[in-house]
Curated annotation (Swiss-Prot):
The gene is RPAP1. One of its GO terms (biological process) is transcription by RNA polymerase II. Transmembrane segments: none annotated. The modification Phosphothreonine is found at T321. Residues 34-53, 61-94, 266-295, 496-531 are annotated as: Disordered. GO terms for molecular function: DNA binding; nucleotidyltransferase activity. The modification Phosphoserine is found at S72, S1121. It holds the Pfam family RPAP1_C. Residues 64-74 have a biased composition (Pro residues). Forms an interface between the RNA polymerase II enzyme and chaperone/scaffolding protein, suggesting that it is required to connect RNA polymerase II to regulators of protein complex formation. Required for interaction of the RNA polymerase II complex with acetylated histone H3. Residues 500-510 have a biased composition (Acidic residues). This is RNA polymerase II-associated protein 1. The keyword 4Fe-4S does not apply.
Amino acid sequence: MLSRPKPGESEVDLLHFQSQFLAAGAAPAVQLVKKGNRGGGDANSDRPPLQDHRDVVMLDNLPDLPPALVPSPPKRARPSPGHCLPEDEDPEERLRRHDQHITAVLTKIIERDTSSVAVNLPVPSGVAFPAVFLRSRDTQGKSATSGKRSIFAQEIAARRIAEAKGPSVGEVVPNVGPPEGAVTCETPTPRNQGCQLPGSSHSFQGPNLVTGKGLRDQEAEQEAQTIHEENIARLQAMAPEEILQEQQRLLAQLDPSLVAFLRSHSHTQEQTGETASEEQRPGGPSANVTKEEPLMSAFASEPRKRDKLEPEAPALALPVTPQKEWLHMDTVELEKLHWTQDLPPVRRQQTQERMQARFSLQGELLAPDVDLPTHLGLHHHGEEAERAGYSLQELFHLTRSQVSQQRALALHVLAQVISRAQAGEFGDRLAGSVLSLLLDAGFLFLLRFSLDDRVDGVIATAIRALRALLVAPGDEELLDSTFSWYHGALTFPLMPSQEDKEDEDEDEECPAGKAKRKSPEEESRPPPDLARHDVIKGLLATSLLPRLRYVLEVTYPGPAVVLDILAVLIRLARHSLESATRVLECPRLIETIVREFLPTSWSPVGAGPTPSLYKVPCATAMKLLRVLASAGRNIAARLLSSFDLRSRLCRIIAEAPQELALPPEEAEMLSTEALRLWAVAASYGQGGYLYRELYPVLMRALQVVPRELSTHPPQPLSMQRIASLLTLLTQLTLAAGSTPAETISDSAEASLSATPSLVTWTQVSGLQPLVEPCLRQTLKLLSRPEMWRAVGPVPVACLLFLGAYYQAWSQQPSSCPEDWLQDMQRLSEELLLPLLSQPTLGSLWDSLRHCSLLCNPLSCVPALEAPPSLVSLGCSGGCPRLSLAGSASPFPFLTALLSLLNTLAQIHKGLCGQLAAILAAPGLQNYFLQCVAPGAAPHLTPFSAWALRHEYHLQYLALALAQKAAALQPLPATHAALYHGMALALLSRLLPGSEYLTHELLLSCVFRLEFLPERTSGGPEAADFSDQLSLGSSRVPRCGQGTLLAQACQDLPSIRNCYLTHCSPARASLLASQALHRGELQRVPTLLLPMPTEPLLPTDWPFLPLIRLYHRASDTPSGLSPTDTMGTAMRVLQWVLVLESWRPQALWAVPPAARLARLMCVFLVDSELFRESPVQHLVAALLAQLCQPQVLPNLNLDCRLPGLTSFPDLYANFLDHFEAVSFGDHLFGALVLLPLQRRFSVTLRLALFGEHVGALRALSLPLTQLPVSLECYTVPPEDNLALLQLYFRTLVTGALRPRWCPVLYAVAVAHVNSFIFSQDPQSSDEVKAARRSMLQKTWLLADEGLRQHLLHYKLPNSTLPEGFELYSQLPPLRQHYLQRLTSTVLQNGVSET
């Protein structure tokens, strides 16, 4: 084997090694392969590869001398395959012609003649080294118009000027000047002076560009002058137009940079000449240099004009005077130095004119007249320079700066502005919403672009601003503090409601079908369009999640940035199930968070700032997993199975918070979030295997609770951890008590059922003795408000645990009923009954009204900083103490107490009466009275929906307890009526997610005879007596209203079945809600409630079966079954009559006009339904209720009615149906006549007299049965000319006769009589002509009876057969007016109209 060369071996040794290698014939270790060109094409691709050619070094052929140090020829690009060389061209000739090597250039060099060039010797000086050049030295001798020339160029120009001046005094110049007769390029000869083109202003006194420099002295002047004369002769032979044309052609051919250089060169020479001539005028030797004007005088004159406009001294009062010798200050631009002046005084605002908002660097809103010092850095802006602070437009402009620090500063200020705006600091000082303004300006995508920045500081500030925008302060604190409330883990999604509401048929479509149908449309929409309606969806469409994962996984940011990212992810997960799924499925995002921020082992972390959160457990990361798990049972199962959360939960829960080697607060929050995550998983029946492993830990934690409760003062974080522990035990107890789900036919419902829980009853049966002492200890603090508020969540969680414990105990088939009944009796006697008798509990009931949202609807006004595209709870400023979520709120404790009492009363019937005594509390009675009273309903906002849901829980549990008590013993009449009114009000207010409560109210309280005490206290008899005493009894017989009410009470079960059929929620929603409220954990699909866009039932729900019946009849041309139609209509009318008579407050939210429209639907459903005697009696009774004197003034048909697009359209349809099928039915006719009153729209009367004249013959309702007074139709007089003409036409043609339609006949006669005898001087000519013509025709009528009625009408009187009184003789004024008109008619004839 050949050895490698070693250091020290000579070239002879290397050649010897080479000969040995060649003689051996071994294969080389490296093979040279010629690569193709970079264009991808290989010109020599057909050649075979070189196999045997090797590079051999031969020292014999090397030259003796080293090569010349000349630059090698530049690399030449190989011709591309698409460019073919000409075949007839010699390659050598082509290379020779394009050869640019130094050897080819040297052969073409012509030596420059320097014999005529003056040589100046250096100036002798007395120092050893030349003087050092300083930039600040005086350069007044330089040209003032040097522009942007370098210092070297300025020095050269100054030297040329000095040379042009000649030697100064005392300067030694050797006699080596040019020979006599030599001229320079600036000195014109006499023969070329005064050369000027004819017709041109340009004179040529000598050559300018061609100087002859470099030629021999004899030939220089001659050649330059010859070229100049040839140019002059050529220019003189051309016309001015040809010169300009040739000039434009040359300019187009030349390089623009070259043209600019020539022009600047000419202008520089001109300025140099001027300066030199001016400086040499006083005396001394000078060269006779004449100024030349260049050809393009317009370009050269511009600098001179600008120089003339510039003053010698600054006109502005600047702090310092700029010197031209300063760097880059040779040309002073005064307009750019305004910023150096002193600021003008702050303008005081004298009017209410709006001014631009300006903010400090901390995001504070500055007053318009505030005067702050300039060293604060708040005056670096152009507009309104005297005002401190920066506007939003200026901050937006700064975010696009090229300096990263400026971008970070702008984002930081904007984040501070958003935080302060959401905190409500600006109040009403700003016109409009800051968040809406920023979102409309594109701030969202500005943040998204900033996240892609390369500077870590900008990324961190952008993430901080994104958190300030998305995460409203206070929202997470509110949801965390209420996690242990009654169903506190359930939340509404924080997403905007859909603007376009679907039809009822589309609402009944399954949610999966809707999502599939809408997803392609949403995917095709661009992110800005999505963000306009939903900020979160717009952000997710911009690949935000992968970017946040990259920041966490690659850049390793600081703790603040990590917490901001986790907070943003929590807000995204709370948006909807879809957003939570996208967060879970983002590649490596959850893996990174679990790996880096939820490790199973970590180094101890002390108190104080943490340098890094990586490899340290983070409570916020645990909370993110908990929020994700709350979105659905499938997400929870994936989290538990795919990310090894079992070991992490065991690691954190197994140790007490003080033993976790973390800061105390962080350890408490981490332990609390771990318990909550486990509780959420247990809400789906998952995570039961952890209970067996951590059973000793949980028992030890429960045993320590009494000691922690005795701490003074109690620590809030510890109380939250204890409440979370009790909530976890509550869910585990429910899981142990739940039985395996039965077989379900529906596959969708079967998917909700899981395997039986791994927790058994024997494993949780020992928890109650440990929890009950904790409850007893906390109840002792009830009389101490401060301590009670501190331990607030603990007694709530204890009560909820006891309720779940007894519920699960009673469901165990192996347990003895006597055991749990005796234990309930013991708990009631020892704990609950003494609690109910405490005065402090009464104070909690009294504070319900002060903390209620229903009793204080103005307390939930939507916040100003609440853009519809970005939903938040709006708890930035914290909840007031006397509010539902405040520290003094009695709702969580009383709701948990009522839940426990309901559980005990349902299991132990003997305790029901004793426990129901709590309902007699005066505070609860007053609270119910105020909730039932009519008033403005709270505006439905995200916070009001959250708060009202908890308030409705308390109301429902109180009503459920009252229903259980009423089933055993009669309730007091006043209490029963109050509870029934409360149930009716609650039924129309329940929000989505409470479908089970709606169903239970329909089953129990609403249609129970126990809550209608009027049926046994003389209610029907009182109704009959009221009919007899009613002033309107002479008009509409009420058909025995008392009898109808008594019959309705007997038919109450049928009425309940009817409403259960038509008002029950969808089956899937009902089952999901039922599983949540019953504790059937295996069927719970999600802890995320449906969107609270509106209540489950409309305000007019008593008419809902009738409305659906009307829609079914409209969609079914063949008609509906008479049996179903008759039964549904009767039950609805009976129930509405009960409400109108005994619970009128339940229908106060339904306007009388809407009730009238619903009654019309009875006649529109079928052509025979209204003929049935029961329906006739019920409709007549309800019509009489609408026509009562206290209700009739509120009947307004001109306003917009709920559920109705247009009442005139409904009335036109009603007239069509009346004309077709009524056959003169009096009740039908009464409903037709009711909207024709004078105070209603004239459109309704025009519809009858203009389009349905044939219906007049069927309106045979007698005057005595008219439901309202006749004066409602005749007063005030009609002023619509078209309707008056229709009245007169129907009277004259006989279409309207007193025996066919007595009511409208009297109405038409009254209005026509009032019109023809009206003498209003302000009437138009058209009205006067119509009045005169109508009176003339009336006087000439052949029908004497009609003529007598129209002329002698006096007053309406429904007791007379005609319906009005007549004058026996016309009044004198009318008689005189009629005689004057008739005399004119006899003379001129009757005018035609």
